[in-house]
Swiss-Prot record:
E.C. no: 3.1.-.-
Protein name: Endoribonuclease YbeY
Keyword Transmembrane listed: no
UniProt remark on cofactor binding: Binds 1 zinc ion.
Binding positions for Zn(2+) per the UniProt entry: 121, 125, 131
SUPFAM superfamilies, per the entry: Metalloproteases ('zincins'), catalytic domain
Subcellular location: Cytoplasm
NCBIfam families in the cross-refs: rRNA maturation RNase YbeY
GO molecular function, one term: metalloendopeptidase activity
GO-annotated cellular components: cytoplasm
Its biological purpose: Single strand-specific metallo-endoribonuclease involved in late-stage 70S ribosome quality control and in maturation of the 3' terminus of the 16S rRNA.
Any one GO biological process: rRNA processing
Keyword entries, A-Z: Cytoplasm, Endonuclease, Hydrolase, Metal-binding, Nuclease, Ribosome biogenesis, rRNA processing, Zinc
Species name: Salinibacter ruber (strain DSM 13855 / M31)
């Protein structure tokens, strides 16, 4: 009997009351992966809450504040510079659905679209994009908009 391998994508709904459609999540993720010219080796996507994301932010990054998404590469060595790495995405993305629920009105969008933006943002980090500087922030925002507009209905005004 051949060995069993884990699926390249696992989605965990770990929020007590909020969730996103798994089919749409898979579609958004696959679009980003294809557009970036990479593949999924293994991605664990966890949809969770403020407490979990803040605890991870403190434990692993030594940041004592809330954030909307955290990405952790499971690859050895430095992350790729940006764009296709050729190795495939291998990592974990934690999305704070509470932040999406609290902030979506601020950006005149739906809760779902804001949460999908966090998913795309986390993937872009795993591909190698960096938003530590304003130019990187602008590039990532441009990519997020491009990918969301390609796969999701236009936001209502």
């Amino acid at each position: 009997m051949p060995p069993e391998y884990p699926e390249p994508l696992s989605i965990e709904h770990d929020h007590p009351s909020r969730e996103l459609d798994a089919g749409t999540l898979r579609y958004v993720i696959q679009h980003v992966v294809d557009a970036e010219g990479t593949s999924l080796t293994h991605l664990s996507l966890v949809l969770t809450d403020h407490d979990t994301v803040r605890r991870l932010n403190q434990s692993y990054l030594d940041h004592d504040y809330d954030t909307d998404v955290l990405s952790f590469s499971l690859r050895e060595g430095p992350a790729p510079s940006s764009g296709a790495s050729g190795e495939g995405i291998e990592g974990e993305v934690y999305v704070d659905l509470d932040t999406a629920a609290e902030r979506h009105d601020e950006f005149d969008t739906s809760f779902e679209r804001e949460a999908y933006r966090y998913v795309v943002h986390g993937l872009l980090h795993l591909v190698g994009y960096d938003d530590a500087q304003p130019a990187g922030q602008d590039k990532m925002r441009e990519k997020e908009d491009q990918y969301l507009n390609a796969v999701l209905p236009a936001p209502s005004s």
